[in-house]
Amino acid sequence: MIPATLNTYLVLSAVLFAIGFIGVLFRRNTLILFMGLELMLVASTLGFVAFSRFNGTGGGNVFVFFILTVAAAEVAVGLAIIVALFRKRQTVEVDELNSLKN
């Protein structure tokens, strides 16, 4: 088995971030947008953990806890907003959720 290097983790982090970014850019479903944002947060967390692991410092791990705290708050608020929008409009498509129309 080939040992994983810092570059391996950073490439994986970049690929995950790119997949999440593409999901945010090209999808019109709010749940998919939300999942893309979460994937981008996980990718940045992986980068911090990789730098922390290979540099021998614990500073990256502190940022991971902050990122996970923000992600947990984002999940709670984001899903509550999506559920409220679905109950009111019966859709989760971004194109149909114009609050300025009617």
UniProtKB/Swiss-Prot annotation:
Enzyme Commission (EC) number: 7.1.1.-
Keyword Ligase: no
Catalytic activity line of the entry: a quinone + NADH + 5 H(+)(in) = a quinol + NAD(+) + 4 H(+)(out)
Primary location class: membrane
Subcellular location(s) of the protein: Cell inner membrane
Residues passing through the membrane, by range: 6-26, 31-51, 62-82
Signal peptide (UniProt feature, chain positions): none
GO cellular component: NADH dehydrogenase complex; plasma membrane
InterPro entries cross-referenced by the UniProt entry: NADH_UbQ_OxRdtase_chain4L/K, NUOK/Mnh_C1-like
The entry's keywords: Cell inner membrane, Cell membrane, Membrane, NAD, Quinone, Translocase, Transmembrane, Transmembrane helix, Transport, Ubiquinone
Example GO BP: ATP synthesis coupled electron transport
Gene3D superfamilies: 1.10.287.3510
Membrane topology: Multi-pass membrane protein
A Pfam family this chain is assigned to: Oxidored_q2
Superkingdom field: Bacteria
Subunit structure: NDH-1 is composed of 14 different subunits. Subunits NuoA, H, J, K, L, M, N constitute the membrane sector of the complex.
Described function: NDH-1 shuttles electrons from NADH, via FMN and iron-sulfur (Fe-S) centers, to quinones in the respiratory chain. The immediate electron acceptor for the enzyme in this species is believed to be ubiquinone. Couples the redox reaction to proton translocation (for every two electrons transferred, four hydrogen ions are translocated across the cytoplasmic membrane), and thus conserves the redox energy in a proton gradient.
Family recorded in the similarity comment: Belongs to the complex I subunit 4L family.
UniProt protein name: NADH-quinone oxidoreductase subunit K
